[in-house]
Structure formats: C-alpha cells, structure tokens
C-alpha cells in the first residue's frame, strides 16, 4: 500500500525530470541540493585552531558533494579586496556629501580552489552561507544558499540551467576602428624584449578602483545602501580573480552612491554618458579622491543592446581612465564579466576575434555574450603586454597604501587616531559591538556583545582588546536541544519534522516509519547515500538518514519534497535515542563528531 501511494505522489510532485526553483540569481531549472560542512582547522598535533577575534576567518574549508562525489573547497580571504584608505560616499537629501571610512578588512569575500584539482578556482561570498562559483573537473558550477530557515541546504547548478531574463546577447559599445592587422601583430610579437621591459612586465600591477552607483540603480534597489554595497563587493571580488593571469590586483579604493540625484545627466547614449563621466572624474572626483580607474554602474537602459562602454588604452589618463556599465541583470556573475570586459579595454585590449580561444569559454573580451566569462584569451594577454610596453602606465605600479591622518583626533569620525582604541562613528551610527562610541575606547572584557539566539548558540563577550565581537560561538555538536527532540549540529537543531515544515509548510510533518523503510530498496527513489555514483540502500537502522518523507498532518502518506534527486535527511538529525545521522548512517552521537 505504501509503495503504491509513493508512486502516485512522486508523479504529482515531479511531472517531468528537472525541477525548477527561484534563487537569488534567477529561475534555475535543474540543480543539486548539498549541505556544505565546515572542516575545522587543526594546528600541529591535531589541536583545533582557536577562534580568532574576528567575525570571519582568514582561511576555511568546506566539504560537500557534486554529482554524488565528495569535494573539499579551500577558501582564503581576499585580503587585498579593499585599499587601506577605502572610503564610502553618499549624499544627504539636501545634497551634502557624506564620506566615511568604514572598517572593511574583516570581510567575508574569498578566493579558493577545489582540493587536489590543480586548475580549479573559486570566488565565494561567505557572509550568509556560500554564494559564488567554482571550477570542478573543467566545468563551472554556481552555489548559493536555499532560503530555508535553520537549514544548511545549498543549491549547486550550471550556467546553462539558469533561465535567461533576456536571450538577446549583451553587447559592448566600443567600436573597433583602429585594429591592427594580424600580420602587424605577429611582427610585433617577434621582437625580443630588453631586460628592462621584462622587469616591467613581471612587476605586479595594482589598480585602485573606484565605483560609482548612479541614482537609477540606487532607486532600483529600493534605496537600500547595504544591499547595494554587498552587490558591488561581490562583483569586485569576482573581477579581482579574473585579472590574476595578467598579474593585476584590483583594490577597491572607494564606493560612491548617488543617493540624492545624479551628478551629471546619465543618458541612454553610451558614448555621451562615457564622455560626461570622464569629465566628472577629472574635474570633481580626482581632486577629492585619488584612484587609478573609475567605473559608473548605472540603472539606465543604454540604446540598443549595449551594456557597457570604455576608452581603449586609457589607464592613468585623468579623463579617460573610466568605463560605464549597465546593471542589466540580477546575476552578479554577468555584470562582473562586463566590468572586467570594460576595464580590459582601458588596459589596451580589443575585442576578441573568432580565432581567439580560451578554456573554459566564453572569453572575457568577446563583443557579444549571453553567459558569464571567466578567462582572458591568449589574444587579450598579448594585446595587454603590447599596451604595457608601448604606453608604460605608471599609476598601476604603486601598491595601495593607507593615507596618514595628521588632523586632530575627533571621536566619532570613523578614523582611529592618537589616543583612540577604536572609532565606530557616532553612538547612533556605531555598529561595533565592543567599541564605546562615546569614548572611542574598547568596551571592557566580559561585556556581552551577542546574546545566544537559541539552544545551539552561545553568548559572546568582548575581550577588552578589540572593537569586534568575537566569532560567533556555537554549542558543541551533540548537545541536546528543543527539549531533547534532537541534538545540536553546527549551530542548528535539525529534526525531520522541522525539515518537512520548512520545505513544504506548516501543515506538514514527518511521515510514519513505514515510509522510511522504503529507503532499504536503494533504487532511484529511495536510498541512503551515494558512493562512486551508485545509490546505496539503507540498512534497517539507517532508514531515517536517507531520503526524507513528509506527510500532511492527519494523513498517512509518503510525500517526497520537490527536488530532482529528492531531499535527504540533514546531517546531525536525530535518528534514535543518542543517535544522529552522519553521511547517510545512524551513528552514536558520542562518536559522530
């Protein structure tokens, strides 16, 4: 009876293979659900690394599965994402300029790679779960959290599985009227560089990058400055890694949001707006904030299919080291590709021809694109080197340094000056839990700075040596929670019932045990875990650690939550007295962690 009912419900939930879900990046028609598990960092001798006095760690590792195979994602914080004299500017309704220097070095933006894969790379935001992309076995995968409360579930998908908002290719507005012939390029490449030229090419380059968000884009995101800042940070973190093969480091030196009105008329004609922006940078921006290059992110719809425009070979020029980019798609990877493309033009790189290739494609400097781009072609790298030797731009040779502050100390101006231990702004604006905004001194040790939010969390106390609240501490894994209904696991209290409720709604609960016995079959519909691409049936004691079954309250059914591969019981879920799920098996809680 149960098996027959299961078939009927599966047909209702999966009318065709490939379920669809709306994620932050758009509508995804095929995806895999994974549960990334953080791997504790160990010092020599197997002792766990002590928690740093920062909100985010410098290095992290996460383990999860891709196509049923385990992978380990190594992450390292992009410490050079922000210049040390990074500032943020917005405008009051009356037009007053408001510039601050917020503490941004303890951020959550990472680069990384997949363990044991030499050519892999990753760009990840770890602010709230894992969001970004990584390369695995020659293919690019995107990852982002599923919006399920108290769950570590993430979706992994490929670009081809995202339904495009618009199938029309994005186009760069740069017109190619001065291309050299293939023959002349070949002749140029045959010259032998002098030792001085080789040294110049090998020197690491630094671009202090300034981003302006226009008023249309500000209003499009409902005047939400924090959301806009996160979007820009994620974009520049992605841009940064694209320029690594060119030995260029992109450091964000400033972010400006035109929150009251545009500072010049932003027009649909991209060439006109680019010219106006270059003049504004030269006459207004540079006198008050140094930068090597500035880009305008705009909410305007440029004429035709144009989404960006830039000057070619113009870096370090006061009125031409600029580009404009339309924020045309909710997917950060697409807009970041356009930012990279236009900056490539500033660095002397033209559009790729049909003979230019890169792996994986598409190439960054293609004139038309419908997918994110991650690599410069060999043609682009050659043109960049030729531009460097021809123009010798000097502004990109200086490593970003902090600006000395010599003015009298003022508590509340965001600058840590002589006699101050911290400065988080005014008492009304301060967001630093362990800095006394009135005195600009650290709060005393044992001052509670973060309360425990539930059974599986612990309160945090200031150290007296830092303005930041220590890293969020969690109750140990295996600690009883929710009146012994389950055990803590990585800060959550996972139960089968709560998993059904979050996936299907408050009118659902966990199915009776008879449904879970189906997991002993090990077929496409019911299993415990994957090993080498094979679905392994559950042992009798493990059935509640395999595929999840739910039912409407006051009914007896075996409903599978919607997902192409089903939803599995979350790691750490209670499967018996003193027992928890771990890798598809029901094990003793005392030995599970």
Swiss-Prot record:
State the free-text cofactor note.
Binds 1 zinc ion per subunit.
Where's the motif D/ECD-tripeptide? 455-457
GO terms under cellular component: extracellular region; plasma membrane
Q: Known EC number(s)? A: 3.4.24.-
Q: Please, which domain of life does this record's source organism belong to?
A: Eukaryota
Q: Where does the record say this protein resides?
A: Secreted
For this chain's UniProt record, which GO biological process terms are given? proteolysis
**Residues making up the signal peptide according to the UniProt record:** 1-20
Report the SS bond pairs.
Answer: 316-395, 356-379, 358-363, 411-440, 422-435, 424-430, 434-462, 449-469, 456-488, 481-493, 500-550, 515-558, 528-538, 545-581, 575-586
The alphabetized UniProt keywords are: Calcium, Disulfide bond, Glycoprotein, Hydrolase, Metal-binding, Metalloprotease, Protease, Secreted, Signal, Toxin, Zinc, Zymogen
Can you give the residue ranges of the Peptidase M12B domain?
205-400
Name the positions where Ca(2+) 3 binds: 457-458, 460, 472-473
Positions with a binding annotation for Ca(2+) 1: 208, 292, 395, 398
Point out the glycosylated residues in this chain: 319, 490
Q: Which residues, in ranges, are excised as the propeptide?
A: 21-196
Per UniProt, where does Ca(2+) 2 bind? 410, 413, 415, 417, 420, 423
What family is it from? Belongs to the venom metalloproteinase (M12B) family. P-III subfamily. P-IIIa sub-subfamily.
Its quaternary organisation is:
Monomer.
What role is this protein assigned? Snake venom zinc metalloproteinase that cleaves the membrane-bound precursor of TNF-alpha (TNF) into its mature soluble form showing the same digestion pattern than ADAM17.
Can you say what this protein is called? Zinc metalloproteinase-disintegrin-like kaouthiagin-like
